[in-house]
Structures are given as C-alpha cells and as structure tokens.
Amino acid sequence: MRGEPAFFEIGVPDAKRAKTFYGELFKWTFHPMGGGDQAWVETPTIRGGIHDEDPESRIDIFFAVPDIDAAAAAVRDLGGHADDPRPEEPGFGRFTYCRDNQGVRFGLHQPSVA
C-alpha cells in the first residue's frame, strides 16, 4: 500500500461546475461533503473529492502511507516540504500536502483504520 495513489482532490473556483463537467465526462456520481457544493466520489479504483473557492485550479494526487507523521518527516529529511498532517477525517483518514525537493506538489494519505 505504500506509495500507491490513494486519493485525488480537484480544487476549483466553482465546485458545482466541476461536478457537472466531471460527472458528465466520467459518469461519476458525487456525494455531499462538508458545506456548499463540496463533494466526494468513489471511482472503480480510487476515491476523490471536489472542493471550491480555491484560488488555483488544480488536481492533487495523494499517495498512501501507513504512518503519515513518519512519511511527512521523511519528506522533510529528503529536502522537501510537508505541512503538518491534518487530524483524522472520519471515513477518509489523514491528509497532508507536500512539495518534493524540486517543488512538485503532492499529498500523503493515511487511510482510516475503521
């Protein structure tokens, strides 16, 4: 499970428009999450989310790790940057954003135990 793509996030200014676009394109069904038009989707191979009011439109890939705190420390030891991991999101796990030693943005994901 270490290093496999585990989750993706689509950050956009308008989540409603993104849900319509990706829903039509890939035939995805979105489930409400949080407030507003934020949502999550379960594809045949990976879970993902759409959030809005993001100043930079982008897609982030999160890689699975068994221990997010240790993985974030390893990113830093290797010359990258890792935000402090977020608390557990029930049903989803823990997440953090990172940049590698050349500035490429990616995420780490520790899946929920339950």
How would you label these PLM feature ranges?
Residues 6, 10, 31, 72, ...:
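Vicinal oxygen chelate
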Residues 16, 29-30, 69:
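Secondary-structure boundary/capping signal
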Residues 1-19, 46, 59-63, 112-114:
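N-terminal beta-strand motif that seeds the catalytic metal site of vicinal oxygen chelate
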Residues 27-59, 105-110:
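Conserved short beta-strand elements that form part of the metal-binding/catalytic scaffold
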Residues 46-49, 58, 65-74:
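Residue-level hotspots at or immediately adjacent to binding/recognition sites across diverse folds
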